[in-house]
Amino acid sequence: MRGSLIVVAGIALVVVTISAQGNEKPSEAFTKAMRDNADAARAIRVASKEFEESGAGAQDFDPFEKAAATMKASFTTTLTYWQAQKVDGAVGLSEKALKHVAALEAGAKERDYRLVLEASTALNETCASCHMAHRVRTDDGAYEIKIK
């Protein structure tokens, strides 16, 4: 019986150790990039709501252009982080996000809300995919990065 408990405890220790090795705290630059992206995404949602409620009224594309500029810088930081970590899936999603940001920027400059909406929707889906695959919430409510 005692031998069985030792084996079970040993297996549990190995599982916990392996799980912990697959996560790490993100760098300050990465954390700032994610926070900047969250703020920009929030600005896009607010601007979209205002845009849709204005009907044929004054339609402001400036918030979309500003958000795209912020996200371009943030996703460049994100891409660099994932390239350094050699996590191909996250690299691909970061590159995809940058393409959606370029489409968002183009739609805003062309003053074409349909393009802005398509790009921001695709960007949200890409962000969600990356978060599901490469982020884990810790017991204290913070996030860590899944490296493996």
What are the residue ranges of the model-derived segments?
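Bacterial N-terminal signal peptides
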Residues: V7-V16
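Extracytoplasmic c-type cytochrome modules immediately beyond a signal peptide or single-pass transmembrane anchor
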Residues: A20-N124, D139-K148
